[in-house]
Regions:
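WD40/WD-repeat beta-propeller blade N-cap
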Residues: 7-13, 49-55, 91-97, 138-145, ...
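Residue-level detector of Asp-centered blade-edge/turn motifs that repeat once per structural unit
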Residues: 20-21, 62-63, 104-105, 152-153, ...
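Acidic, Ser/Thr/Pro-rich low-complexity intrinsically disordered segments
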Residues: 255, 264-474, 478-526, 530-533, ...
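Short loop/turn segments that connect beta-strands within beta-propeller blades
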Residues: 39-42, 81-84, 123-126, 171-174, ...
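Conserved strand-to-loop turn within each blade of WD40 beta-propeller repeats
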Residues: 28-31, 70-73, 112-115, 160-163, ...
């Protein structure tokens, strides 16, 4: 029998859910409202307003305190059930959202819709705005996602789609466990049995079926191990200089796999791309022997010798087939927005930019780039490696020009032969080949790092990428062992440091041949009254770091003899070897008068925020990966009344200052301080690092440093 009929909506209903405590019912539909009802009395308790589109789905958290709603306005909203207050709006989706579900423990929230993705957020206990970060954005189906449901143990997530497929996911890693047989019609209702490994699926044709739910422990739950973009260099001992390597001249014909010119490696091959005997083009093949795991740097020297040839190199097997290097599995799709991207620029605007994490790889028509810095807002570009200069390409791909609207894919690299479950997006195979050096050191000449997958004979094919040829199209092909190394250069020498303030300097590393480890720069022997942040550490894979030289308010003017005592060294490790290099000096540093504005970077704690510490004993701000911390910027206005723009530098890669906009941090006129929030990406390793603030006025005055301590979630925060 019908117990109650609840009336109140002005249009058709799309979602009705009962709270876990059995007290309330929530309903939503095309009238863009959500209504909460008392189940016992049938009385309407309150109407939740805020959506600008139809409400398609609802989900209560297990404690019945929070309600989540999915809407055609492209947002998920979190609501306080007791008060009806909107707590947060999750707006990462660019298309309509059809479904939403809390995990059984209430810590995660999953949603899906028209853009074929399943997004998962980590939900705080309060659900307040800013405390519910996006954790996962997973391309899930080739057509819109209609329904999602968690298994009671929280280990399994089930999704259905307009592609008529039901997919079973590992809820933690979002890897596919299995894909069930194609259904007769769209599955618009899903429910996982509370005690048995099965689920009920309701189809659009009015039929309901019971399906077996695969057990959680399956082979596909084994985590896939991605590859690094840097090969761990092997130590081959002392290597001959380039001019000492044996040289061999090509012997034509050598265009076919059966006709290569033999090359003893390490060695240098001398060739010419020229046509003869009526051939339309010329390709030179060189043969060399390698053992499994052997590492070789293969590069050309042509444009640097003023040759017109634009080389391309490819590594082939003995039969002439391309040797695959790795697999790139697409996990999210995107595209270039706003404007095209040339082959040099680091900045680009990509669709779904808020889902792009730092260090994500993006595949663009054969080029692989790596995300370095998130966009500072919708009107800014996302930045890709390196920190400065022209864009780098990874895995020895070549930088190219990309058109507006060109498809892009966030990809994860895996070894050749890895079994990758189908997720509806492509898997790209990268071969050992290169046109222009992706690290931008050789100009239009080619370079790649080859690691032999098996013992045997390999071929290197050299050609002109344009198909041109001529008698003067000469080149050198160099095959040599890696020689990991680095040099460090200091910029910002010879500054004038104002009394009681500081000036910034930068140390830049030039890395060579697979050297990717940290580089520690130490500064010793400063004059009395001066202090420098030391050591300054260039993080693994990065190319620069910043430090501060400060002068005490009562520092005496230094002499040239004082600065002659200052020494700067850079130290790095490769395997069991320690490499020490001298760095150019700070130069002659002058002591300037007290500046018009002083900058202070302090803990965000009223009890000790104003307490100044000695430069060698900086205060410590502690942060946990995946969370936030705060600190305070304070300025002393001595003779400066205008607004002050500030930047915070030398934070660990993966820790950013939130919500700073295009112009950095601003302290308006008549104000002297501002609290800033630091956000730490989940993958940032434990470390300690000095960072500082720079006021972009009065000669760029710099604060004394704070120390940031990144700790693991299990380590106590001190």
């Amino acid at each position: 029998p019908v117990l109650q009929t609840l009336r109140g909506h002005r249009d058709s209903l799309q979602a009705v859910k009962i709270s876990p405590n059995g007290k309330w019912l929530a309903s939503g539909g095309y009238d863009q409202t959500i209504k909460l009802w008392d189940l016992e009395t049938g009385q309407e308790l309150r109407t939740l307003l805020g959506h600008n589109g139809a409400v398609f789905d609802l989900s209560f958290r297990a404690d019945s305190r929070l309600l989540a709603s999915a809407s055609g306005d492209r947002t998920i909203k979190l609501w306080d059930v007791a008060t009806g207050q909107r707590l947060d709006t999750l707006n990462q989706s660019l298309m309509e959202l059809y479904c939403v579900a809390f995990s059984p423990d209430g810590r995660r929230l999953a949603a899906g819709g028209v853009d074929n993705r399943i997004r998962i957020w980590t939900i705080s206990d309060s659900g307040q705005e800013g405390s519910n970060p996006l954790e996962v954005s997973q391309f899930a189906h080739e057509l819109p996602v209609l329904r999602i449901a968690y298994a009671p143990d929280g280990q399994t997530l089930v999704s259905s789609s307009e592609d008529r497929l039901i997919k079973i996911w590992n809820a933690q890693s979002m890897t596919i466990r299995s894909t069930l047989a194609e259904q007769a019609d769209w599955v618009v209702g899903l429910a996982v049995h509370p005690r048995q490994p099965s689920l009920l699926a309701g189809r659009l044709d009015g039929t309901i079926t019971r399906l077996d739910l695969p057990a959680p422990a399956t082979a596909t739950d084994t985590p896939l191990t991605p590859l690094s973009d840097v090969v761990t260099a092997m130590d081959y001992g002392a290597q001959p200089a380039l001019e000492e390597l044996p040289r061999v001249t090509e012997s034509e014909p050598n265009d076919e796999a059966s006709q290569p010119t033999a090359l003893t490696v390490p060695g240098v091959a001398l060739g010419v791309i020229q046509t003869a005997d009526g051939r339309a083009k010329d390709e030179d093949l060189w043969a060399f022997e390698a053992r499994q795991g052997d590492q070789w740097i293969i590069e050309t020297n042509a444009r640097r010798l003023k040759s017109p040839v634009d080389t391309k190199i490819e590594v082939l097997d003995e039969s002439g087939k391309a040797v695959p290097r790795l697999l790139l599995r697409a996990v999210r799709d995107s595209e270039i927005e706003f404007r095209s991207m040339d082959s040099n620029q680091r900045g680009v605007r990509l669709k779904y930019w808020e889902e792009l994490l730092l260090n994500d790889y993006v595949y663009l028509n054969g080029e692989v780039i790596k995300h370095y810095q998130q966009r500072r807002g919708p009107d800014a570009d996302g930045q890709f490696y390196p920190e400065n200069g022209n864009r780098h390409a990874f895995f020895d791909t070549t930088c190219r020009t990309h058109a507006l609207g060109e498809p892009a894919y966030v990809v994860v690299p895996y070894p050749v032969g890895t079994t990758l479950p189908n997720n509806g997006l492509p898997v790209f195979t990268l071969n050992y080949e290169n046109d222009d050096d992706g690290q931008r050191k050789l100009g239009a000449d080619s370079r790649l790092t080859f690691v032999a997958p098996a013992t045997g004979k390999y071929l290197v094919r050299v050609s002109d990428v344009r198909g041109f040829a001529g008698a003067d199209y000469r080149y050198e092909l160099i095959v040599r062992r890696p020689r990991p190394d680095f040099t460090v250069t200091l910029t910002g020498a010879n500054p004038t440091v104002n009394a009681g303030s500081g000036k910034e300097f930068t140390v830049k590393a030039e890395r060579a041949d697979l050297f990717a480890g940290p580089i520690q720069v130490d500064v010793t022997g400063l004059p009395p009254g001066f202090h420098v942040t030391s050591p300054v550490v260039i993080q693994p894979g990065l190319h620069e770091a910043r430090g501060v030289i400060s002068a005490a308010a009562d520092a005496p003017a230094p002499t040239e003899a004082n600065w002659a005592q200052t020494k700067i060294t850079a130290t790095g490790r490769w395997g069991d070897k320690t490499i020490v290099k001298e760095v150019n000096s700070l130069g002659t540093i002058k002591l300037g008068p007290k500046p018009k504005v002083l900058v202070h970077l302090q803990l965000d704690q009223p009890a000790n925020a104003l307490a100044e510490r000695a430069p060698q004993e900086p205060a410590v701000v502690t942060i946990v990966p995946g969370r936030r911390a705060s600190c305070r910027l304070r300025i002393e206005r001595l003779e400066f009344k205008d607004r002050v723009q500030l930047e915070v530098f030398n934070l660990p890669h993966g820790v950013i200052v939130e919500d700073i906009g295009l112009n950095g941090v601003l302290i308006p006129e008549e104000q002297t301080e501002r609290t800033i929030f630091l956000s730490c990406e989940p993958w940032v390793p434990a470390m300690e690092r000095l960072f500082h603030a720079v006021a972009k006025v009065d000669g760029d005055q710099v604060s004394l440093p704070l120390q940031i301590r990144v700790v693991s979630p299990t380590e106590p925060v001190r």
